[in-house]
Swiss-Prot record:
This is 26S proteasome regulatory subunit 7 homolog. The 26S proteasome is involved in the ATP-dependent degradation of ubiquitinated proteins. The regulatory (or ATPase) complex confers ATP dependency and substrate specificity to the 26S complex. Belongs to the AAA ATPase family. It is found in: Cytoplasm; Nucleus. InterPro entries: 26S_Proteasome_ATPase (IPR050221), AAA+_ATPase (IPR003593), AAA_lid_3 (IPR041569), ATPase_AAA_core (IPR003959), ATPase_AAA_CS (IPR003960), NA-bd_OB-fold (IPR012340), P-loop_NTPase (IPR027417), PRS7-like_OB (IPR048723). One of its GO terms (cellular component) is proteasome complex. Interacts with UBR1 and CIC1. One of its GO terms (molecular function) is proteasome-activating activity. The keyword Glycoprotein does not apply. Present with 105 molecules/cell in log phase SD medium.
Length: 467
């Protein structure tokens, strides 16, 4: 290998075209060339779109500044955005109010809605001379209102500037000013939150087609509940009042609660579901108060359906055991029958009851006027059992050609709940065999396990003698 200093002699000679003159220098790009390179390959509207994006970012920054999105570390908006005068004015307009009850309305001519007036509280009058009202009637403009502040006193007061005389009625709850006790706000009736939570907000996903073996019962149920709500003119033409109460009774698992869920899905009326044991309270009078507030809330609705499940918890026949243990339950039942058909009209309220023991209910609760129709949910027949199998197997992966009538013949005197358990067990047999489809053999095994094997746990025959 030649020495390093002799490498030059071994290089190939350059041609004249490849030789670079020594005086060539690198020329820097001008501003125009840079702009050309930046815009090279850009679309015709790229500059306008870029300008629009910058304008949008500028507007967004100004909106965030005005709205106070970017706040300081202390959690407050910048000081230049403070509106101290507006805050003071807002605090001056809104004051905390006291809750009172309007017990009497005294007209401007000295008369009241009642035959007597309370003269003892006239010395506590604190009238408002600058009262403004939208009502043109002079009596309403000069009317005074007797309010009762709990554990304080009674006062005769006037209305605030933002309250109309037509908004105030005797017996309603009102919000009064703490200093002058003027009525500033009408309040809705007080209802226990536990009663309000009984309202069904979301409609169930059960329809009448999901209820098998209850064709006649569904027709009777719809005549009582749906027909008066959808076609009230039919009853008005005949001059009769539509039935307002219905009792669903039968052995457990025959579809009573399922039909009630289908009614809640079908109608647009407010649906209230009450479990009988919820009305049994510890303290005296609590259960009757809940029943009273329940019907008060139902009367505020345009149309309402109340469903009492397991009504035998509070609707049992009255008796004296000597110890008085069931006195509170009997008081609750008396309040219930009073609300159903007492001195005050029930209104457009339909009531449904469900029980497994109709023989234990009080005769006063079962009389016509309170419960107009009694529907028995008996055991399904052969056609009904086959229909129930088809309904429950609709969402299952089963093979074609299963003889549902044959399987139904193997399940005599079975309820809908037991037939659903048969479908579930058939799916379990398919899972044990690592199959994705349930076969007819799986259903036959399930019938042998559920209907024959669990027969000693069935209470259907015992409940049949009660219905």
């Amino acid at each position: 290998m030649p020495p390093k200093e002799d490498w030059e002699k071994y290089k190939a000679p350059l041609e004249d075209d490849d030789k670079k003159p020594d005086d060539d220098k690198i020329v820097p790009l001008t501003e125009g060339d840079i702009q050309v390179l930046k815009s090279y390959g850009a679309a015709p509207y790229a500059a306008k779109l870029k300008q629009t994006e910058n304008d949008l970012k500028d507007i967004e920054a100004r909106i965030k500044e005005k709205a106070g999105v970017k706040e300081s570390d202390t959690g407050l908006a910048p000081s230049h955005l403070w509106d101290i005068m507006g805050d003071r004015q807002r605090l001056g307009e809104e004051h905390p109010l006291q809750v009172a009850r309007c017990t009497k309305i005294i007209k401007g001519n000295g008369e009241s809605d009642e035959t007597t007036t309370d003269n003892n509280n006239s010395g506590n009058s604190n009238s408002n001379s600058n009262q403004q009202s939208t009502d043109a009637d002079e009596d309403d403009e000069d009317a005074k209102y007797v309010i009762n502040l709990k554990q304080i006193a009674k006062f005769v007061v006037g209305l605030g500037e933002r309250v109309s005389p037509t908004d105030i009625e005797e017996g309603m709850r009102v919000g009064v000013d703490r200093s002058k006790y003027n009525i500033e706000l009408p309040l809705p009736p007080r209802i226990d939150p536990s009663v309000t939570m009984m309202t069904v907000e979301e409609k169930p996903d059960v329809t009448y087609s999901d209820v098998g073996g209850c064709k006649d019962q569904i027709e009777k149920l719809r005549e009582v509940v749906e027909l008066p709500l959808l076609s009230p003119e039919r009853f008005a033409t005949l001059g009769i009042d539509p039935p307002k109460g219905i009792l669903l009774y039968g052995p457990p698992g025959t579809g009573k609660t399922l039909c009630a869920r289908a009614v809640a899905n079908r109608t647009d009326a407010t649906f209230i579901r009450v479990i009988g044991s919820e009305l049994v309270q510890k303290y005296v009078g609590e259960g009757a108060r809940m029943v009273r507030e329940l019907f008060e809330m139902a009367r505020t609705k345009k149309a309402c359906i109340i469903f009492f499940d397991e009504i035998d918890a509070v609707g049992g026949a009255r008796f004296d055991d000597g110890a008085g243990g069931d006195n509170e339950v009997q008081r609750t039942m008396l309040e219930l029958i009073t609300q159903l058909d007492g001195f005050d009209p029930r209104g457009n309220i339909k009531v449904m009851f469900a029980t497994n023991r109709p023989n234990t209910l009080d005769p006063a609760l079962l009389r016509p006027g309170r419960i107009d129709r009694k529907v028995e949910f008996s055991l399904p027949d052969l056609e009904g059992r086959a229909n129930i199998f088809r309904i429950h197997s609709k969402s299952m992966s089963v093979e074609r050609g299963i003889r549902w009538e044959l399987i139904s013949r193997l399940c005599p005197n079975s309820t809908g709940a037991e037939l659903r358990s048969v479908c579930t067990e058939a799916g379990m047999f398919a899972i044990r065999a690592r199959r994705k489809v349930a076969t007819e053999k799986d259903f036959l095994k399930a019938v042998d396990k559920v209907i024959s094997g669990y027969k000693k746990f069935s209470s259907t025959s015992r409940y049949m003698q009660y219905n």
